[in-house]
């Protein structure tokens, strides 16, 4: 009888799309094309739902590190389907050190977190305090996803603005956070740009992404353009 890991690899290769593999490898720097099988995201999501109903799926989740990028994507989707909050946080903590690219990081989005925002915020600060690039990025992403609407607190952007990193994928997420904050909490987010609380690159990138957004008014866009730091 085959173990689940062998079965999963066979299924992933059966779902392989070589044209997509070539396309995808160009989007994710630092990941070797040989580690990409080339499974499209909808197929991975569907397979994750199928696997999530199996009692032996934990054997796959425990088999870290995975060899293939697609296994990591599948792993992220499986965690995202978790129904128990505390077990899901544990699964995230186990997996994050092995996340080595923006795509897997950004696909990791547990639905159960929506029901546990009171407890989640402490975990977010912990992830943001990590020295691991994608743990920090994940923490900022969760803050952006869950705390810019009804659960927003004006002190939260200060925690993001205080971050300093030499990592492109951390700074890009900080910019994305503030661009989204400008769309959802404009009056609270604007002072961070007016007072130049971000480093110059992240400041300008946040403005660029905000100006590109359909959720920002024309008047707001004109205001933001004037705040760009000239080189």
Label the model's feature ranges:
Residues 1-231:
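Alpha-helical scaffold domains
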């Amino acid at each position: 009888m085959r173990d689940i890991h062998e079965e999963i690899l066979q299924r992933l290769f059966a779902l392989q799309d070589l044209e997509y593999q070539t396309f995808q490898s160009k989007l994710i720097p630092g990941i070797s094309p040989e580690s990409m099988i080339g499974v499209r995201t909808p197929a991975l999501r569907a397979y994750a739902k199928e696997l999530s109903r199996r009692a032996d799926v934990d054997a796959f989740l425990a088999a870290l590190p995975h060899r293939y990028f697609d296994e990591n994507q599948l792993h992220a989707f499986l965690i995202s389907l978790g129904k128990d909050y505390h077990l899901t946080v544990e699964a995230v903590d186990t997996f994050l050190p092995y996340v080595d690219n923006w795509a897997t990081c950004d696909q990791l989005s547990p639905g159960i977190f929506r029901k546990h925002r009171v407890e989640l915020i402490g975990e977010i600060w912990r992830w943001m305090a990590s020295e691991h690039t994608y743990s920090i990025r994940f923490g900022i992403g969760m803050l952006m996803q869950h705390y810019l609407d009804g659960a927003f607190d004006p002190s939260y952007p200060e925690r993001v603005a205080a971050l300093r990193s030499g990592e492109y994928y951390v700074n890009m997420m900080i910019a994305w956070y503030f661009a989204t904050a400008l769309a959802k909490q404009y009056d609270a987010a604007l002072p961070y740009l007016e007072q130049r609380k971000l480093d110059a690159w992240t400041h300008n990138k946040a403005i660029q992404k905000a100006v590109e957004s359909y959720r920002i008014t024309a008047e707001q866009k004109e205001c933001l353009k004037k705040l760009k730091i000239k080189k």
